[in-house]
Design a protein with these regions (language model features):
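Intrinsically disordered, low-complexity linkers and terminal regions
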Residues: 1-30, 34-118
Length: 118
């Protein structure tokens, strides 16, 4: 099922770039691009205890964004052009040809000072 991005409203159609926020008792919020999740967290005034998740770009498996390896690629076109990619581990990143030339980004750049959990 293709969810709509909670930030830009585009369809979340490519699992390699997907992200989501979950909180107890709340509907999950889906994002088509890690840049959309970052922008939503910066703008949101919601105080729910959100946990941020990102799809591993290579395996499409969910992992906690706070523990993920994140990088920005100028060569990979992401849905909203952020260039942000995530992997569950450095080993997954190293096995992904799309990671070549990508520059590491600290998760705090996406999650903000609250670490994506509020």
């Amino acid at each position: 099922k293709n969810e709509a991005c909670a930030w830009c409203r585009m369809s979340v159609s490519d699992a390699r770039f997907a992200a989501q926020l979950t909180a107890p008792g709340r509907e999950p919020k889906f994002f088509d691009d890690l840049g959309c999740l970052r922008d939503w967290l910066k703008a949101s005034r919601e105080s729910a205890p959100w946990t941020a998740w990102a799809a591993d770009h290579r395996t499409k498996e969910w992992s906690r964004l706070a523990n993920a390896v994140v990088a920005r690629s100028a060569a990979v076109q992401t849905p909203m052009s952020s260039g942000l990619l995530a992997w569950a581990s450095a080993a997954s990143r190293d096995a992904d040809p799309d990671a070549l030339g990508a520059k590491d980004v600290p998760a705090s750049e996406l999650l903000g000072p609250a670490g994506g959990e509020r």
